[in-house]
Amino acid sequence: MLLSDSHIHTMFSSDSEENPVNVVNNAISLGFKHICFTDHNDFDAPLEDGKVMFDLDFQEYIKYFQNLKESYKDKINIHIGVEQGLMRSVADRVNSYDSAKQLDFIIGSSHLVYGEDPYYPEFWEKCSAKDAVLTYYESILDNLGCCHNFDVYGHLDYIARYIPANSYSYNWHDFNDLIYIILKTIIEKGKGIEI
């Protein structure tokens, strides 16, 4: 069995403090042959306490992981990737990101719903939770129509983790037709789907 992980966040992401060296050593101890670091980059993510979030310092990131890759080349294959937030309002930046092709892998994900973050409780106050989830899936289809620079679409049901308790019991069948169109669109674009 080939063990690998291609969705890893580290201290380069606003939501992690993990040291990449620890990740590499753990992967080696587990017998992994390949890993791919995919720290977050979300253009125009909402500020948190006045701080810019999920804005990757690309050059520093590439330099760090190229050095790490070289240091461990005889023990494990390290790939450099990114989890890129997809959104119509930043499609030009998404589509031109990594124009020098320094990345091995890009996960495209919809973390924001037309610029709003479902992580925050205020997101859920504007309409019913079920309608908010519907809007999320509609935004994914919109994002897929304009953002093309990714290899695999990440965590399609991302929003489910943030649905407020006792508001709506998530069931993907409620959005079956729309999810079918989303999956068909991803496949027609020749992209993979993260499971």
Predicted regions, residues:
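Domain-core and long-helix interface of multi-subunit machines
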Residues: 12-14, 103, 107-195
